[in-house]
Design a protein with these regions (language model features):
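Gly/Pro/Ser/Thr-rich low-complexity, intrinsically disordered segments predominantly at protein N-termini
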Residues: 1-191
Length: 191
């Protein structure tokens, strides 16, 4: 029987977090509807592993109080009782409550953009921008060598336009890390 046939039509966040999801895999709650997430492809998985490793090594080397987590649950500020998103990586500099399903106070959120999840990913990114603690969002592309770095301005606003970075390196100012694109994309299969 398909998992689509066994999922409830609508759920609250509380019901979703208590729900025993059918089968393996990760689920998000989008506007009250549980949605199964597709397994990551090879390039997606490789890019996620590399960026998480680079960030973790940097945070440890600088004795930072911040922590990187892969696939953390995040409750957006808007319609919080009906949504639960799972970004690829997030960094928090706040204490982590291991009993909580959701990461509170993320400072940096990273999404890996595949052609098949473009609309969903950008919807989530717009929701992350409404979380007061989020200072920076990194979007990593799998169809080509490209990243977008979105940074909250000093006045709390986000940029209207993003300049794609397709060569050289980029800096995650929220944690003080410079990442060469060649290092990030090495062995990813993305050209």
């Amino acid at each position: 029987m398909s998992s689509a046939l066994t999922t409830p039509d609508q759920m609250t966040l509380e019901e979703f977090l208590a729900w025993d999801a059918p089968g393996p895999g990760r689920w998000q709650l989008i506007d009250g509807v549980p949605v199964a997430m597709a397994p990551a492809g090879r390039a997606h998985g490789r890019l996620q592993a590399v960026i998480a490793g680079l960030i973790d090594s940097h945070l440890n080397a600088t004795d930072s109080p911040c922590v990187a987590l892969t696939n953390p649950g995040i409750v957006p500020a808007f319609q919080a009782g009906r949504n639960f998103f799972i970004p690829d990586v997030a960094v928090t500099c706040s204490e982590i409550d291991t009993d909580q399903a959701a990461l509170h106070h993320p400072a940096l959120v990273i999404e890996i953009l595949s052609p098949s999840n473009h609309a969903e990913t950008w919807r989530n990114i717009r929701a992350y921008m409404l979380i007061d603690s989020v200072r920076e969002i990194l979007v990593i592309y799998t169809a080509s060598v490209r990243v977008d770095v979105l940074q909250r301005g000093a006045n709390g606003s986000w940029p209207d336009d993003v300049t794609p970075i397709t060569q050289g390196a980029f800096t995650l100012t929220s944690i003080g890390l410079n990442v060469p694109l060649g290092v990030l994309y090495r062995r990813s299969g993305v050209a």
